[in-house]
Swiss-Prot record:
Residues spanning the membrane: none
Enzyme class, broadest EC rank: isomerase
Keyword ATP-binding: no
Upper classification of the organism: Bacteria, Bacillati, Bacillota, Bacilli, Bacillales
Species of origin: Bacillus anthracis (strain CDC 684 / NRRL 3495)
NCBIfam families listed in its UniProt record: hemL, PRK00062.1, PRK12389.1
Subcellular location(s) of the protein: Cytoplasm
HAMAP family in the cross-refs: HemL_aminotrans_3
EC number, UniProt record: 5.4.3.8
Chain positions found as N6-(pyridoxal phosphate)lysine: K270
Requisite cofactors: pyridoxal 5'-phosphate
Keywords annotated in UniProt: Cytoplasm, Isomerase, Porphyrin biosynthesis, Pyridoxal phosphate
Associated pathway: Porphyrin-containing compound metabolism; protoporphyrin-IX biosynthesis; 5-aminolevulinate from L-glutamyl-tRNA(Glu): step 2/2
Catalytic activity line of the entry: (S)-4-amino-5-oxopentanoate = 5-aminolevulinate
Name assigned to this protein: Glutamate-1-semialdehyde 2,1-aminomutase 1
Length: 434
C-alpha cells in the first residue's frame, strides 16, 4: 500500500510558484477529486509508473489514452532515438511523413488525403475551417459533453433549450463565437432533427465522437450514427468524426470502421503519435483539396510532420499490427469489468460500468449512462474518495469521474487480478463510511 507522497507534495508546492495552477493541463490537477497535490511521476515502463517518492502504480491513465502500447515500448523508443540522432526538425518534406500518411490511409479507408498537425485540438480546429470553406456556411453542431479540444469554437456549452445556440463554456470565448455553435444531446435523434430543421441551412458540419470518450465510455445507440449521417447530409452539411481518442484504440483503424459508418472528415491524435505530440486530419479528396496550397483554406505548422513524431507514429502502428493485441485488450477488459461488478455487488456499492474492449468507465450511480446529462448526475464525491483509495493501493486512474480507464498491451492478467482486489478493498472502505 502506498503510504507517502512527501516529494510529490513538495514538488507541487514549488510548481505553484512557477506554473499556473501547478499543472500544465487542468485535467492533471486533483480539483475534481477533492483537491490535494497531484502525484508527480518520474518514470514509466510497460503498464507501470513510479512516482518521485518511489511508489509503484499500475497505470490505467495511459496519458488519457495515447499510451496503448505501454510506457517506453522498445520498438517506439528505438524509432524516436534514431529520429533524434538524425535531427528532430527540418522544415522540409520527409520520407517518413509519406510513409506514415500511407499507413493511415491503408488503416482508415475514409481518408483519401491527410495532413499532419501537432495536436488533436489543431486537427479538429482545422477540419471545421475546411468544412466551412467547402460548404460556404459558418455554423457548427456538436453533442453536449463531447470535448473537441480547447479552441474557441468548441468550448461551448448548450443553450437553454435543445435546439438553441450555444453559450461560452470558458472565459475568453466571445458570445459571438458561441452563437455559431448548436449543441444537442448525444444518442437523441429527435432533438438532432429538431435542431437541423431550425438551423440546418446554416450548418457547415457536425462534430461527432463516434464512441464518446469524454464523459466516460459511451457507445452510440444502434442506428444512431447512421441517422446522424442521413440527417446531416440531407441538410447539405458535412459529418466530422473526432477520432482523437478512438482511432486505433478499439481496433486497428478507426471507430468508423468498427461501427461501419463513414464520415466526410476525420480528426486524429493521441494513439497515432506513439506518445509524442501529433495530430492529423483527412477525408474525401474533393473536400481536402480546399486546404492550402491547393485551395483557399489556410493551415500551416512549423512542427507539423516533424521526423520524431512521424517515426514514433509509424513505430506505434507497426506494434499495433501484431496479431492478437486487440483481442488481448478485449479479454483483459472483460476480466476487469466482471471483477469490478462482482466487488460492487459484494460490498453493496451502486455503480454502472460502461466498457468497450480495452476501455471502461465506472460511474457511481444505478442509472444507465447514454448521454452527458446522465453522466453529470453521478456521485462525484464518491468517485473522489474511490480515486484516492485506489491511489493508496497503487492503482493510477484519471482524477475525474468523467474519464476512462485505458488498458495497454502491456497489462497482464496478474495486473487485472491485483486491480480487482484493490477495488474490493476500496469498495469495502467506502461501504464502511457510508
Amino acid at each position: 500500500m502506498v503510504v507517502k507522497f512527501t516529494k510529490s507534495e513538495a514538488l507541487h508546492k514549488e510548481a505553484l510558484e512557477h506554473i499556473v495552477g501547478g499543472v500544465n493541463s487542468p485535467s492533471r490537477s486533483f480539483k475534481a477529486v477533492g483537491g490535494g497535490a497531484p502525484i508527480a511521476m518520474e518514470r514509466g515502463k510497460g503498464a507501470y509508473f513510479w512516482d518521485v517518492d518511489g511508489n509503484k502504480y499500475i497505470d490505467y491513465l495511459a496519458a488519457y489514452g495515447p499510451i496503448i502500447t505501454g510506457h517506453a515500448h522498445p520498438h517506439i523508443t528505438k524509432a524516436i532515438t534514431t529520429a533524434a540522432e538524425n535531427g528532430v526538425l527540418y522544415g522540409t518534406p520527409t520520407a517518413l511523413e509519406v510513409k506514415f500518411a500511407k499507413m493511415l490511409k491503408e488503416a482508415m479507408p475514409a481518408l483519401d488525403k491527410v495532413r499532419f498537425v501537432n495536436s488533436g485540438t489543431e486537427a479538429v480546429m482545422t477540419t471545421i475551417r475546411v468544412a466551412r470553406a467547402y460548404t460556404g456556411r459558418t455554423k457548427i453542431m456538436k453533442f453536449a459533453g463531447c470535448y473537441h479540444g480547447h479552441s474557441d469554437l468548441v468550448l461551448v456549452a448548450a443553450g437553454s433549450g435543445p435546439s438553441t445556440l450555444g453559450t461560452p463554456d470558458s472565459a475568453g470565448v466571445p458570445q459571438s463565437i458561441a452563437q455559431e455553435v448548436i449543441t444537442v444531446p448525444f444518442n437523441n435523434v429527435e432533438t438532432l432533427k429538431e435542431a437541423l430543421d431550425k438551423w440546418g441551412h446554416e450548418v457547415a458540419a457536425i462534430l461527432v465522437e463516434p464512441i464518446v470518450g469524454n464523459f466516460g465510455i459511451v457507445e452510440p445507440k444502434p442506428g444512431f450514427l447512421e441517422k446522424v449521417n442521413e440527417l446531416v447530409h440531407e441538410a447539405g452539411a458535412l459529418v466530422i468524426y473526432d477520432e482523437v481518442i478512438t482511432a486505433f484504440r478499439f481496433m486497428y483503424g478507426g471507430a468508423q470502421d468498427l461501427l461501419g459508418v463513414t464520415p466526410d472528415l476525420t480528426a486524429l491524435g493521441k494513439v497515432i503519435g506513439g506518445g509524442l505530440p501529433i495530430g492529423a486530419y483527412g477525408g474525401k479528396k474533393e473536400i481536402m483539396e480546399q486546404v492550402a496550397p491547393l485551395g483557399p483554406a489556410y493551415q500551416a505548422g512549423t512542427m507539423a510532420g516533424n521526423p520524431a513524431s512521424m517515426a514514433s507514429g509509424i513505430a506505434c502502428l507497426e506494434v499495433l499490427q501484431q496479431e492478437g493485441l486487440y483481442e488481448k485488450l478485449d479479454e483483459l477488459g472483460a476480466m476487469l469489468e466482471k471483477g469490478i461488478l462482482e466487488q460492487a455487488a459484494k460490498h453493496n456499492i451502486d455503480i454502472t460500468l460502461n466498457r468497450l474492449k480495452g476501455a471502461l468507465t465506472v460511474y457511481f450511480t444505478t442509472n444507465t449512462i447514454e448521454d452527458y446529462d446522465a453522466a453529470q448526475n453521478t456521485d462525484g464525491e464518491m468517485f473522489g474518495k474511490f480515486f484516492k483509495l485506489m491511489l493508496q493501493e497503487g492503482v493510477n486512474l484519471a482524477p475525474s469521474k468523467y474519464e476512462a480507464w485505458f488498458l495497454t498491451t502491456e497489462h497482464t492478467k496478474e495486473d487485472i487480478e491485483y486491480t480487482i482486489e484493490a477495488v474490493g478493498r476500496a469498495f469495502a472502505a467506502l461501504a464502511d463510511n457510508k
